């Protein structure tokens, strides 16, 4: 079975959690990581056990075009611009909550993803876990 290739944008605490969780899935792997802060990239390098491409700009990762899923785990205020860039790829997208920091930006993303040909998923803690009731 072909492995699902993840490109993670943002190398902070949540990205490290995602790296650990993705490593538990047999048919998934992190193949690319982008963050403007080299210290954050280095912390992720310590836990990644596979060959990964590292970038200091998410646009470089997009240009390489080597991922199946973009996972956006950056500071909240950066989501809108990164989403605009990643949506153009038509690849699968998982973005950490909140989607954006204001209603205007959320509505813009809603409009940009109407009819989106791939999965667009907003990560909401516990809502996607079958063992927890939906609030």
Placement of each model-derived feature along the sequence:
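Short, well-ordered coil/turn segments that N-cap beta-strands
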Residues: 28, 52, 91, 118-120
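Conserved acidic E/D residue at the C-terminus of a beta-strand in Rossmann-like folds
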Residues: 34-35, 96-97, 129
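Short, Asp-centered acidic motifs that coordinate Mg2+ and/or phosphate
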Residues: 32, 69, 119
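Beta-loop-alpha module in the N-terminal Rossmann-like domain of NAD(P)-dependent dehydrogenases
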Residues: 18, 52-112
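N-terminal Rossmann-like dinucleotide-binding module
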Residues: 1-49
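Acidic-histidine catalytic/liganding microenvironments
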Residues: 25, 48, 64-65, 116
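Single conserved hydrophobic/aromatic residue that forms the stacking wall/gate
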Residues: 125-135
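Rossmann-fold dehydrogenase core element
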Residues: 108-125
């Amino acid at each position: 079975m072909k492995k699902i290739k993840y490109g993670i944008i943002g190398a902070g605490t949540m990205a490290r959690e995602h790296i650990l969780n993705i490593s538990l899935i047999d048919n998934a792997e992190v193949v690319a990581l982008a963050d403007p802060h080299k210290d954050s990239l280095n912390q992720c390098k310590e836990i990644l056990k596979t060959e990964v491409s590292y970038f200091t700009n998410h646009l470089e990762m997009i240009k390489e075009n080597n991922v199946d899923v973009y996972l956006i785990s950056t500071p909240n205020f950066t989501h809108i611009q990164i989403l605009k860039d990643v949506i153009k790829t038509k690849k699968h997208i998982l973005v950490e909550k909140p989607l954006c920091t204001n209603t205007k930006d959320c509505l813009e993303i809603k409009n940009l993803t109407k009819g989106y040909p791939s999965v667009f998923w907003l990560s909401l803690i516990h809502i996607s876990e079958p063992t927890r009731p939906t609030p």
